[in-house]
């Protein structure tokens, strides 16, 4: 038993967990619960534009075509709800959307401002439109529009969306219910 636990620990990929095969989505992509694909190679550039879903899809697919990325290879993110963490510069908390909160609320001290803004880590909660999984287009659309009213500096190029951990509603580990699977947290990697 101890050997199996150690074996599982060392054979586990840092960024993936395979729980259960769920079948395929409407496009024939295999769907696994709890298996998180890499989201590298998507040539998206974040900007200040707030898109409708139709406008975003048009711009997104034009971007993929321009960079010879096959949209059929884009993986789904199989979770009904996720938290996404990213860094940005804000002038005030009023820039946060209702689905967002600061990682450390106490970091907004006046003396910490640089050029009238605070550099903060933000968590955004997203729910899949179909209640089961996010398409790549859907999650990037939601992330893009959430970040559009914030300053990203020169880090505007999408590099990856990486699984980080699970967050639980309880404040103490003893308070976590055995049935609470938590909400997966992903980090947006941006480059310049």
Task: Please annotate each region the language model reported.
Residues 116-138:
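Short, contiguous acidic and Ser/Thr-rich linear segments
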Residues 93, 112-114, 118:
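The transition from N-terminal targeting/processing segments to the mature protein
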Residues 13-15, 24:
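Intrinsically disordered, low-complexity N-terminal tails
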Residues 17, 27-64, 70-74, 78-80, ...:
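Ubiquitin system architectures
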